[in-house]
Amino acid sequence: MIVGIIGVLLISVLASPAGAQGYSSREPAEPSDSYWKKFALGAGVSLLAHESAHILTSIALGFHPYIGFDKGRPTVYSGIDSQRYPHKQFLFSAAGLTTQALINEAILDIPHSRGGAIERGILAGGIGTTLFYITIGRNGDVSDIAFMARTSSLSKTQLSLIFGGVSAIHAVRIWRNPAYSHFFVGPTENGLGIGFQF
């Protein structure tokens, strides 16, 4: 609950500058370099919200989270004994993806000027993280999906369908909204540019 409130507050704060991020076809498009930097910033904000949700949930439940490494990858550990407190571990594991879904939902629902690069990055960060966790990241030693499956009656497949379904709905809503045209595809002088360019 606390994480959800923090997520809504975060969106309220981020919604204020969204007016300056809006894209109008009458205005010149942002330079490509600036656009991708802002997009990456938005994706970083989404990932920071994901990890912060884990930390805040653990603290709210009365535990002491810590950051460590799993096979060289930085990882937030709950500090919760999952054998003794499986429900609390489930809440910790679900907090990151749930917060990102709530942030994406708020962006898509709260009226504001839409389509800025930072906003697109936040949306892509939420969808991308979910896509990672429901595919190649679902079987990792410290995978959120794997921990949720171990600490609940839901299987990895069921959890993947739940979180993947929400992100799929977000993707469809983005695809249907003209403010998000060219979300990952943009016109170039030679046709279409797909994905990222380095």
Features from the language model and the residues they span:
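Hydrophobic alpha-helical membrane-embedded or membrane-associated segments
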Residues: 8, 38-42, 46, 100, ...
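Membrane-interface loop-to-helix entry segments
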Residues: 87-103, 151-163
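Active-site recognition of the HExxH zinc-binding catalytic motif
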Residues: 46-59, 96
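Extracytoplasmic/secreted envelope proteins and their assembly/folding machinery
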Residues: 49-50, 103-107, 145
